[in-house]
Amino acid sequence: MSVWAIGDLQGCYDITQRLLEKINFDPAQDTLWFCGDLVNRGGQSLETLRLVHSLRAHSVVVLGNHDLSLLAIGARSEEEQRKVNPDLLRIVMAEDRDALLDWLRMQKLAHVDRTLGWMMIHAGLAPKWTTQMAEKHAREVEQQLQGGGYRKLLRNMYGDQPGWSPGLSGYDRSRAIINLFTRMRYCTPRGRIATDDKGTPGTQAQGLYPWFEVPGRVERDLKIVCGHWSALGLTITQGVHAIDTGAVWGGKLTALQLDSEELRVVQVPGREVTGPAPVARAPRRPRERQGRQRSRGNRGNAGNAAAGPKPSVDTPQD
């Protein structure tokens, strides 16, 4: 039995299949940990989501910022859904969209296996969060996503503010937690995220640190595997194992074996970026489904009017 963590797929279905072949993945005995951002930009997001969904009995998934954006898109009106890029549009118009999105909404922000000694997140942790605190805060938001009021959470999750504080409440608290788990790269020693700095360490503004190198951060009792930061490349430092190696940008897709005495890294080449992503043309919604989908979309749209302006639905926050 092997446990493999895999970096950001971002809709690169063919590349994901090649990586699974290279690690000799056997669903009868192996387990996959997906570090989030299953979808968007790679051109094969529907196929990728279906693949991971089909492996749900043999895998663990944490949500990334692109996954949450897909859920937000799926909860909006049909008119708004049609504004997204064709890669994501194919998902929200697919016959099995409800099964895929309902399953995705049930996934975690953080996964912990204390027997194995690992925690998986998508992006980062607040400097003062222990793994126990991180797990507790992740469960807060997961319960909201998995509950009946999830549409309201998805409408209110966008924005860079406020920074994390233990005294936050309501959607401000949920937003701050989501931003830490799914958008973090650099931050201040007090844990305030710098969303505009996305390059390699050394290029950031003064006073900012990679989240895993912040002075005064707490010592953590688990090794951490994460994705999100493709510019960082494969990085193993301070107990953190960052494995988003930019498959969607022409880099590599990386798998890291978590249950071996010596860390084993397996990679395959990423997507060719000389041309457009290999996305199929977005299908028309079947005529017999239009009434039901429009009705569901209108219910969601009633709440959108009070939510104020939102970011473009085809530009997930990084």
UniProtKB/Swiss-Prot annotation:
The keyword Iron does not apply. HAMAP family: ApaH. It comes from Xanthomonas euvesicatoria pv. vesicatoria (strain 85-10). CDD domains: MPP_ApaH. Hydrolyzes diadenosine 5',5'''-P1,P4-tetraphosphate to yield ADP. Belongs to the Ap4A hydrolase family. Residues 282-297 have a biased composition (Basic residues). Residues 298-311 have a biased composition (Low complexity). Keywords: Hydrolase. InterPro entries: ApaH, Calcineurin-like_PHP_ApaH, Metallo-depent_PP-like, Ser/Thr-sp_prot-phosphatase. This is Bis(5'-nucleosyl)-tetraphosphatase, symmetrical. Residues 269-318 are annotated as: Disordered. It comes from the Bacteria. SUPFAM superfamilies: Metallo-dependent phosphatases (SSF56300). It catalyses: P(1),P(4)-bis(5'-adenosyl) tetraphosphate + H2O = 2 ADP + 2 H(+). The keyword Transcription regulation does not apply. PANTHER family: CYTOCHROME C5, PTHR40942. One of its GO terms (molecular function) is bis(5'-nucleosyl)-tetraphosphatase (symmetrical) activity. Its EC number is 3.6.1.41.
